[in-house]
Amino acid sequence: MRHKPHFEDSYNENVARAKKALREYLDLKGIPTVIHEDYGPDIKAYLEVFYEVEIKKGWEGDWNENWDTVRIPARKKRLMKNGRRVVFWVMNNDCTQAFRVYSSEMKDEYIKPVPNKFVPEGELFYCLPVEVGAFISLEQ
């Protein structure tokens, strides 16, 4: 396959401007970056990601196919303030299976009151359709 020749002066002039513009944009989004010249990708980004875990005591073994939602307490919304990236993991009782969902999928439209023994009038939960996340086996 043919491609244009590499013009070092043009490359140096343009790539520096492009890297500067993208790094400024990523900085505004709170994504730290570093430039490492190794003829690989131009910019290496470091995303800060947090993980929140819960155990669903009533979930034994494989996921019950009759359960069409996974519940995560709505009070966990505080963990996502200021655009913080959080990956939520809801595990079965023996921690061999998990449901993983990204904070970007945790929409307010999923918040609903769910009565339980601790809050009979209904505690607020994200009632997430299983399609918005993924089931992961944690067995080695």
Language-model features: locations:
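Nucleic-acid endonuclease domains
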Residues: 1-50, 55-140
